[in-house]
UniProtKB/Swiss-Prot annotation:
Pfam families: SpoU_methylase, SpoU_sub_bind. It is found in: Mitochondrion matrix. GO terms for molecular function: RNA binding; rRNA (guanine) methyltransferase activity; rRNA (guanosine-2'-O-)-methyltransferase activity. It catalyses: guanosine(1145) in 16S rRNA + S-adenosyl-L-methionine = 2'-O-methylguanosine(1145) in 16S rRNA + S-adenosyl-L-homocysteine + H(+). Its EC number is 2.1.1.-. GO terms for biological process: rRNA 2'-O-methylation; rRNA modification; rRNA processing. S-adenosyl-L-methionine-dependent 2'-O-ribose methyltransferase that catalyzes the formation of 2'-O-methylguanosine at position 1145 (Gm1145) in the 16S mitochondrial large subunit ribosomal RNA (mtLSU rRNA), a universally conserved modification in the peptidyl transferase domain of the mtLSU rRNA. The gene is MRM1. GO terms for cellular component: mitochondrial matrix; mitochondrion. Disulfide bonds: none annotated. NCBIfam families: rRNA_methyl_3. Residues 311-353 are annotated as: Disordered. This is rRNA methyltransferase 1, mitochondrial.
Amino acid sequence: MALLSTVRGATWGRLVTRHFSHAARHGERPGGEELSRLLLDDLVPTSRLELLFGMTPCLLALQAARRSVARLLLQAGKAGLQGKRAELLRMAEARDIPVLRPRRQKLDTMCRYQVHQGVCMEVSPLRPRPWREAGEASPGDDPQQLWLVLDGIQDPRNFGAVLRSAHFLGVDKVITSRRNSCPLTPVVSKSSAGAMEVMDVFSTDDLTGFLQTKAQQGWLVAGTVGCPSTEDPQSSEIPIMSCLEFLWERPTLLVLGNEGSGLSQEVQASCQLLLTILPRRQLPPGLESLNVSVAAGILLHSICSQRKGFPTEGERRQLLQDPQEPSARSEGLSMAQHPGLSSGPEKERQNEG
């Protein structure tokens, strides 16, 4: 009976794929009548694979083709598949990826009740690459290189939000510490709006040694701290500067610390400069710092806005006033922004489709 059940499940999986794929091949939209004939499949998760969830992470993962994909799990209403769902189906068909229609309750359980938007994929995991594969870029190659270094960020949603900002603002490389850091999980990918799927993340076992090596090569190692305090003995040892006063004149490593404790003592001691975000009011105890992902966005924008080719104030006004006829520069910037990383409301993105 177990074998018969397995055969039936595999047969229905092929039927689902065939029904969807026929419409996709002929440029049609799979309709409600066709979908209503498909058996709702009670899936058994595949071992050693991850369940990537969310419309944009799954779409970008298929486009990037860095993961092996075992199955696409796709839900659709009676109106059929439209927009990105139809695009997902076409891409899966082109790669011969089985497409199954699971029960909503089953998908909720498999995703541990995360916001999956009715789209999931069973995929191979992504791992950070060794930092030496990031290349041995020297200061003479480009004085405006910016690598983001993460020292022990553990919350997957913080990690994902940081990656999203880094990708959007043009960070060249992201380096993490291998120990005490969040891995590249599906939650990180969803929180990054899929940015994790299209950017390389590197890691090192010796973050302090990495920083010292880059400093010897001429890079500026800039750490980050909360509001300066006279009670902190380390404040007098390393210069502290507002991010608004920082001039980006040579290749820079921007180092962000752990959500709770900030930079470790060893890492902070390897920094040549500490950047801070100054508050605009007197703060009560406990509110002297920002969430690490929020701080990352502010710091990165403050630095990256100095990059040559960053749109000027006049160009930004033109983009806002005449979005239909962008200049050559703004068109290039528009193309550089990856699809799926738009600035639309998060609620709208979560509920689309």
